[in-house]
Design a protein with these regions (language model features):
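C-terminal boundary and immediately downstream tail of ABC-type ATPase nucleotide-binding domains
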Residues: 2-5, 237-240, 250-269
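ABC-family P-loop ATPase nucleotide-binding domain
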Residues: 1-27
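ABC family nucleotide-binding domain
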Residues: 18-249
């Protein structure tokens, strides 16, 4: 380490065999509360990993650190073999290179619990905003692709409406289309169905299932046990900022080793 910079090289070290996402010994505190206590996780291209745990276990914080919406206190995050550089700032750790963070975010899309659509824009405008203004792609091309993506998630007929005129399930599907429009290598889902009425959950899960079948790399924080069992190829259970259980769905659901995970499963049936 030099000049106060951690995990930074001038030229990113990229390996063809590198995981799509790698998190090593990640730690994050808010004040005196340590939320992540040395979490490690690795996702290969095409992995669908469901991240389970009770409220406050650190699931969402981990996703937000991967996308640098929160800056970890220590640890290493690698996206496609490129290590995100951190350095000590006046208020704690900060990105060593904001342009690197911007580049990483263009490859790692996040779908939020609360949709995060821009209320003053139509659904179509929401989807094309970043491709046009961040990626500088031709507007006509972005519109054509956006309409295909909205068709894919089943709401192309809503393209000229504003978010407030859509149901929660439709808004979340629009948010997924917006994420896909950036051509991400990795998709992060932060409890994408928890804000929805029960009858709307299925329509969002169907879209997510189809994305998994396409071979997309997905990290999904969820309480949907059926999705975790049937769609994921790996399940990670966090408890108080630590990975308590990890493995294939058949293993962790069929013969859980952790007593806490057993209790968690029984409380979510």
């Amino acid at each position: 380490m030099s000049n106060g910079v951690a995990s930074l090289s001038t030229q990113p070290a990229v390996s063809e065999a590198a995981p799509a996402v790698s998190v090593n010994n990640l730690r994050k505190s808010f004040g005196n509360l340590e939320v992540l206590k040395g979490v490690s996780l690795s996702a290969r291209e095409g992995d669908v990993i469901s991240i389970l745990g009770a409220s406050g276990s650190g699931k969402s914080t981990m996703l937000r650190c991967i996308n640098m919406l929160e800056v970890p206190d220590s640890g290493e995050i690698r996206i496609g073999g490129e290590t995100i550089g951190l350095r000590k700032g006046r208020k704690g750790m900060e990105p060593a290179d904001q342009s690197q963070v911007d580049r990483i975010r263009s490859r790692v899309a996040m779908v939020f619990q609360s949709f995060n659509l821009w209320s003053h824009m139509t659904i179509l405008e929401n989807v094309i905003e970043a491709p046009v203004h961040v990626q500088k792609r031709p507007k006509a091309e972005c519109i054509a692709e956006a309409e295909e993506l909205l068709k894919k998630v089943g709401i192309v007929d809503k393209r000229n409406q504003y978010p407030s005129h859509l149901s929660g399930g439709q808004q979340q599907r629009a948010a997924i289309a917006r994420a896909l429009a950036m051509h991400p290598k990795v998709m992060l889902f932060d409890e994408p169905t928890s804000a929805l009425d029960p009858e709307l959950v299925g329509e969002v899960l169907r879209v997510m299932r189809s994305l998994a079948e396409e071979g997309r790399t997905m990290l999904v924080v969820t309480h949907e046990m059926g999705f975790a069992r049937d769609v994921s190829n790996r399940v990670v259970f966090l408890h108080k900022g630590v990975v308590e259980e990890e493995g294939a769905p058949t293993e962790v659901f069929g013969a859980p080793k952790s007593e806490r995970f057993k209790q968690f499963i029984s409380s979510h049936r």
